[in-house]
Amino acid sequence: MRFVDTNILLYSISTQTAEAVKAAKAQAVLSNSNLALSVQVLQEFYVQSTRLSRPDPLTHDEALAFIRTWRRFVIQDITLAVLDHALAIKARYQLSYWDSAIIAAAKTANCTEVLSEDMNDGQDYGGVTVVNPFKP
């Protein structure tokens, strides 16, 4: 199973011409069924997609509609066990806490890959490998 980071969701809704190729790739990723997200990813999506300084902000209802659609994927809760695992990952790999929480949620959801533009492509974090789906 593959875990989807927030940036994939944000690119999938982009209407910016400069992001058209990434938007198409992100939409293709999300057309798969064998994906997982976390509550953190959905929260980050909501905050970033409705931010008024964004070139194409969504309304509350629009963002909510996307979030409801993505509930078809496995959604990993953020539990104390995920928090503990994230803190251990942060200490071991020197990642930001938020990236560590993504890796921990992916591992807890039995994912072998995290699809993300924001982390090191190809890096393995204890059995979870980062894959940049936008890399040529």
Label each region the model flagged.
Residues R72-V114:
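Active-site neighborhoods of divalent-metal-dependent phosphate/nucleic-acid chemistry enzymes
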Residues V41-L42, E62, V82, I102:
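Short, conserved alpha-helical segments within structured domains
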Residues M1, I103-P136:
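Acidic, PIN/NYN-like endoribonuclease modules and their adjacent C-terminal/linker elements
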Residues L10-S14, S49-S53, R71-V74, K90:
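Short amphipathic alpha-helical interaction patches enriched in hydrophobic/aromatic residues
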Residues M1-L37, L52-D61:
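Short, well-structured N-terminal submotif of metal-dependent ribonuclease cores
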Residues T59, L64-D84, R92, G122-P136:
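Short acidic, glycine/proline-enriched helix-loop-strand junctions
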Residues A36-Q40, S116:
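Substrate-recognition element of Asp-dependent hydrolases with the DxDx(T/V) motif
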